[in-house]
């Protein structure tokens, strides 16, 4: 009998776009849940930002535990537990927090600013090569 699919997915390495969506989300409204070995990412935004939640889901879909669901006025989803979240957890607490800036690329910054309401991600503002990498679902 084969391995459970979730265990197999824990060995999949996030691509650069996924890493930036994760970093930007964690700097914004996203949060890590669970302890070491079981950490997962929780994404939640007001239902009025449903298009944005689905955009994040499309980029992180392989790691999503379920499709976005509406709870009250919040549309949310969780990822599966993944080792990348254990690796990132120290960067989002304590003295290592400043190291996040070294990892952040323009897409991660855009996600962060969109999360906090300072920016709206729009495909037409990206250069064609950036659009292909950042905005087109894979």
What are these regions (language model features)?
Residues 1-138:
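Internal intein/HINT superfamily modules and their associated LAGLIDADG
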